[in-house]
Amino acid sequence: MATFVSELEAAKKSLSEALGENVKQYWANLKLWFKQKISKEEFDIEARRLLTQENVHSHNDFLLAILTRCQILISAPEGSGSLNSATKPGKPKGKKKISSVRQKFDHRFQPQNPLAGAQQFVSRDPQEDDELKLCSHTMSLPTRGQLEGRMIVTAFEHGLDNVTEEAVTIVICALEKHLKDLLTSVVSRRKAHRLKDGHFRYAFGCNVNPQPYLRNSLAAYNQLIECPPVLSSPTGTPNSGTYVHPDDAEQQAALLLACSGDNLPASLPPVNMYDLLEGLQVHREVIPSHTVYALNMERILMKLWHPNREELQQDEIHRQRLAAKEGLLLC
């Protein structure tokens, strides 16, 4: 992995020297290409415009280094490292057999079928090529290689040289934690739940619901002993007072069942955009950044909006006028 990192840094340094004062414009175009706001052909045209004819190879070498770095992260196993290289217990450690140059050459160069890598012609929808392959369209989390490529572009834009694997792992964990917080805020608005220590939510949608017509129903839920404080015991064991006695737990369960209603809560429909909108409006602390919060709320409101019949007709007329100007015929 260190070899590919050094190759990427060397390619970046060579490209920066070739660009000179145009390096900021190149990073901006690279960011637009990663966001798929411009095509690969447009990005290559802008790169050739910023570079001289003798330095165009620096652009190709840099892109090849980035793609190689991201591809190595995807193809490498998750648990590869120093832990896997340790010798297994119970097996004698033998001498490592040194392979000859002939064996290495035969292993690397194997005869292949030239038609194996040929492109297969499959009938596709013409609109599929115009779709952006972003997370909002694929409905899936970005892969490790895609995320590192995006982080490398952002790091180069802010003057950093490289991105470590630990930083990519931290961003992936932070993304998963953020999505879990969003789901918790939405589910907590749909179904009842209990609190532990005043902040930890659990038991979402439990079958035992309180009976509002009983006077002691609310008190039974408020006085529920979940984690009693540690009590000093004469034996000196610290864990003797950290658990609830089975008789007390059975009495609490019987009281909750007696104070609960006869009917189970009705099943709810699947989570929709209205639930997400309500969850973010109530729990605004889930997205601390005001800019990100405002953009996401705008996207949610746009998803909830649908054009009426008149707007659809006006849009069709506008498309026909554009097609007439370009000399195209609509079917």
Swiss-Prot record:
Transmembrane segments: none
GO cellular component, one term: SAGA complex
InterPro entries listed in its UniProt record: Hfi1/Tada1
Molecular-function annotations in GO: transcription coactivator activity
Basic residues: bias regions: 90-99
Function, as annotated: Probably involved in transcriptional regulation.
Alphabetized PANTHER family for the sequence: TRANSCRIPTIONAL ADAPTER 1
Name assigned to this protein: Transcriptional adapter 1
